Amino acid sequence: MNFGNKIKCSICKKKIFLREKNLFFPFCSKKCKIIDLYQWISGKYKLF
């Protein structure tokens, strides 16, 4: 079955499908989503 293009999770670099039913998109899992949220809260990410 063809789900379309693959992208990489920005946290763990696991490949995921663009059209895959994923509640945590653009991350591969809840864990990666929480890690990203923590990085925003802790100030690792900044908007200029």
From Swiss-Prot:
Belongs to the DNA gyrase inhibitor YacG family. One of its GO terms (biological process) is regulation of DNA-templated transcription. GO terms for molecular function: DNA topoisomerase type II (double strand cut, ATP-hydrolyzing) inhibitor activity; zinc ion binding. Inhibits all the catalytic activities of DNA gyrase by preventing its interaction with DNA. Acts by binding directly to the C-terminal domain of GyrB, which probably disrupts DNA binding by the gyrase. This is DNA gyrase inhibitor YacG. Interacts with GyrB. Its cofactor is Zn(2+). Keywords: Metal-binding, Zinc. Zn(2+) binds at C9, C12, C28, C32. It holds the Pfam family YacG. It comes from Wigglesworthia glossinidia brevipalpis. Binds 1 zinc ion. Gene3D superfamilies: Erythroid Transcription Factor GATA-1, subunit A (3.30.50.10). InterPro entries: DNA_gyrase_inhibitor_YacG (IPR005584), Znf_NHR/GATA (IPR013088).
